[in-house]
Amino acid sequence: MKFGVVVFPGSNCDADCFHVLKNVFGRETVYIWHKEDNFDVDCIVLPGGFSYGDYLRAGAIARFSPVMKKVVEFANAGGLVIGICNGFQILLEAGLLPGAMLRNKSINFRCHDVYLRVENNNTPFTSKAHEGQVLKIPIAHGEGNYYCEPDTLKKLIANGQVVFRYCNSRGEVTEDANPNGSLYNIAGIINEKGNVLGMMPHPERCSENILGGEDGRVIWESIIAYLERGANRG
Amino acid sequence: MAIARVIVELKPGVLDPQGEAIKNSLHALGYEEVKKVRVGKFITLEVEGNDLKEIEERVKEMADKLLANVVIEKFTVQVEG
């Protein structure tokens, strides 16, 4: 199995994702420069950062990078794509996931640990977690206030596409636990087919105890388990 | 050469934390009469060509594709020769 971490101008969590996959999990991992449109991997990671300086809107310009044409094809063919933070924003702009990001309700850039509740463990990204499991994972963003039309939200909930919600340490979804004003406390969603995940928190920053926690591991472990089962590739 | 002006605004009802912060700051300065602030973008494009109608259509396409995110924003386009 081979992971590809896309590098946009302004990505800054690319090396962290690469490190976790390559050194912590010992999996073949390559960088994919945003101008490349010819690569062969089993899972694409769109890392966090500030692609193209987030000029115009977060993710808006990256969405038209040459690499994204291939990412869309890969996703449409069933390939696994995980977008973290800025990667999530890019997936929204690209239309691979529904909705959009607004600035944080508090207007502050929020950079601290949050708690997430796993709402759906029947996905390639969460199968190693149990439903209702509470994960402690850091966030770092100024535009993570997820928004979508009421009809879209209904569909997301009905289809089990809301994968992670912000909660408190006891797993209760409360307004106080919501760091950015996200609709329905949404921290991560999946597409209808279930092969594209976007999440604001950074699992790559908490996959080793030396960094203060290992709760992010479950996401990488789930992806690896899914690929090991030889599930379809894009 | 034509000048196209694109105004991008958040749709009504979509929360604008930036506008709220500016409103609070204006109140702190004593401008209590300000009841609402909405922040948008104003983008000026210099566009080659003479057919203003065609330019307007093209710029609307640009706004729809890139300059605005129509999930949360609306836009207006003005073109002058």
From Swiss-Prot, chain A:
Domain Glutamine amidotransferase type-1: 3-233
Single annotated GO MF: phosphoribosylformylglycinamidine synthase activity
InterPro entries tied to this protein: Class_I_gatase-like, PRibForGlyAmidine_synth_PurQ
Single Gene Ontology BP annotation: 'de novo' IMP biosynthetic process
Active site per the UniProt annotation: C85, H202, E204
Main location: cytoplasm
Function: Part of the phosphoribosylformylglycinamidine synthase complex involved in the purines biosynthetic pathway. Catalyzes the ATP-dependent conversion of formylglycinamide ribonucleotide (FGAR) and glutamine to yield formylglycinamidine ribonucleotide (FGAM) and glutamate. The FGAM synthase complex is composed of three subunits. PurQ produces an ammonia molecule by converting glutamine to glutamate. PurL transfers the ammonia molecule to FGAR to form FGAM in an ATP-dependent manner.
Name by which UniProt lists this protein: Phosphoribosylformylglycinamidine synthase subunit PurQ
Lineage: Bacteria, Bacillati, Bacillota, Clostridia, Thermoanaerobacterales
Gene: purQ
